[in-house]
């Protein structure tokens, strides 16, 4: 696999300390970790993560019962993370602008696309809405 993505409970909570332990010849080239709070994102970066996913930004059916991290965490990530990061969780066309305005330049979308009545159209809408975003 080119990319390996792990949740906090899959890595740190399971005793992992450095993503270097996951790297091997023929193994993943990029390793990312989920985070739900600034301390987890900081720990992921210190542990060698190539990227960090922050969320869920809003309530989402893919993580029922998990509290939303809010746009404040997106703002924190934009100001503090020096590795690529992705906003994820509950993103939709209705709230996308607020996520981008908070500083996100990369997003992950699941439900708003997979639950759409016209999946290709939903994908095109997200791509169109993201076309103005510039990475730093």
Model-derived segments and their meaning:
Residues 43, 77, 98:
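Hydrophobic/aromatic ligand-binding patch that stacks against planar heteroaromatic rings
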Residues 11, 16-37, 65-93, 126-136:
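Alpha-helix-loop-beta-strand connector modules within alpha/beta enzyme cores
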Residues 1-10, 38, 45:
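Conserved alpha/beta-domain cores
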Residues 26, 47, 80, 101-103:
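Structural motif
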Residues 39-42, 75, 121:
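A broad detector of short, well-ordered amphipathic alpha-helices
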Residues 2-3, 28-32, 51, 84-86, ...:
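Structural preference for beta-strand elements that scaffold enzyme active sites
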Residues 31-63:
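Histidine/lysine/aspartate-rich catalytic loop segments that bind and position anionic ligands
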Residues 6-19, 53-65, 93-129:
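Glycine-rich phosphate-binding active-site loops on the catalytic face of alpha/beta enzymes
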């Amino acid at each position: 696999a080119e990319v390996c993505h792990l949740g906090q409970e899959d890595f740190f909570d399971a005793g992992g300390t450095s993503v270097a332990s996951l790297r091997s010849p023929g193994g993943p080239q990029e390793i990312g970790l989920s985070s739900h709070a600034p301390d987890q994102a900081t720990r992921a970066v210190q542990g060698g993560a190539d990227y960090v996913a922050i969320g869920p930004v809003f309530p989402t059916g893919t993580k029922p019962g998990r509290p939303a991290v809010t746009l404040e965490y997106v703002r924190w990530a934009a100001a503090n993370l020096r590795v690529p990061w992705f906003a994820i969780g509950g993103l939709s066309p209705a709230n996308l602008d607020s996520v981008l305005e908070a500083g996100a330049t990369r997003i992950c979308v699941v439900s708003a696309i997979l639950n759409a009545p016209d999946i290709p159209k939903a994908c095109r809408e997200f791509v169109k809405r993201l076309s103005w975003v510039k990475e730093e």
